[in-house]
Amino acid sequence: MIFSTLEHILIHISFSVVSIVITIYFLTLLVDEIVGLYDSSDKGMIVTFFCITGLLAARWIYSGHFPLSNLYESLIFLSWSFSIIHMVCYFNKKHKNNLNAITGPSAILTQGFATSGLLNKMSQSVILVPALQSQWLMMHVSMMVLGYAALLCGSLLSVALLVITFRKVIRIFGKSNNFLNESFSFGKIQYMNERSNILLNTSFLSSRNYYRYQLIQQLDHWSYRIISLGFIFLTIGILSGAVWANEAWGSYWNWDPKETWAFITWTIFAIYLHIRTNINLGGINSAIVASMGFLIIWICYFGVNLLGIGLHSYGSFTLT
């Protein structure tokens, strides 16, 4: 009873803190001068991490098994994974940490859905079904969820890269059309005025374009690093799941919906890594593949559970 109460307290604290973190972070986007706000948002994510860690530990103690037996517990663990990814990047002092825009909303959305009325039955701790009573539960599911979290963060960074890049292309294309449609009937005086304005604005435009270029490079860099980490976790999760499946069902691979979509997810991000490491194909092409992977992950992690079929149906739920 004590641990159950502690779990409810911690989940509400973590949800409240991460909500404040998101608000603070978006305020820093509007007011860059307030450095203290930015630092407090990072500290808020650290508080969130420890709250969710305590929540998972409390649930582990009173349930008697690692809290990854259903969708509710995996969503809480996914939220914890988002916070730990943020902390790893936060303690890397070489680069300014801009991941709050990704990890903060991701954590609050996963926690919000986990604590919604849809998963009330799953929030109650129950005895594990025989298929889950194995030491492989912690290894397989934790690696898969950590992989999902890292791949989701990296994919969202790629989406941001595409938005910034294509916004720039559209703006340039629009300016080019306006330039072609301009009339030159105003003569030499207008030409000299335009030339003067261009010279005055050159330094401003150059600095703005340089900042955009730096931002795109950072997004590509962090997306590649985080997706690479997530790909490793996903690979370990799939391999450990195959070993567990052989022990439980007598076969390493059965092509049920969850396994099939896990393989599709792995293939998509293998293609991403191949394109990203190819000098002639990297950049926009790899970001497009990663953006596709974002949708594939949610189908694999969440969408397949709606079917309620296959060997992984014990983790499913219905929307009725």
Curated annotation (Swiss-Prot):
Keyword Oxidoreductase: no
GO cellular component labels: chloroplast thylakoid membrane; plasma membrane
Keyword annotations: Chloroplast, Cytochrome c-type biogenesis, Membrane, Plastid, Thylakoid, Transmembrane, Transmembrane helix
InterPro entries reported for this sequence: Cyt_c_assembly, Cyt_c_biogenesis_CcsA, Cyt_c_biogenesis_CcsA/CcmC
GO MF annotations, alphabetized: heme binding
Transmembrane segments: 9-29, 44-64, 71-91, 99-119, 144-164, 226-246, 261-281, 287-307
UniProt-annotated location(s): Plastid, Chloroplast thylakoid membrane
GO term, biological process aspect, one: cytochrome complex assembly
Recorded topology in the membrane: Multi-pass membrane protein
Protein purpose: Required during biogenesis of c-type cytochromes (cytochrome c6 and cytochrome f) at the step of heme attachment.
Protein family per UniProt: Belongs to the CcmF/CycK/Ccl1/NrfE/CcsA family.
Subunit note: May interact with Ccs1.
Protein name: Cytochrome c biogenesis protein CcsA
Originating organism: Carica papaya (Papaya)
Taxonomic lineage of the native organism: Eukaryota, Viridiplantae, Streptophyta, Embryophyta, Tracheophyta
Record gene name: ccsA
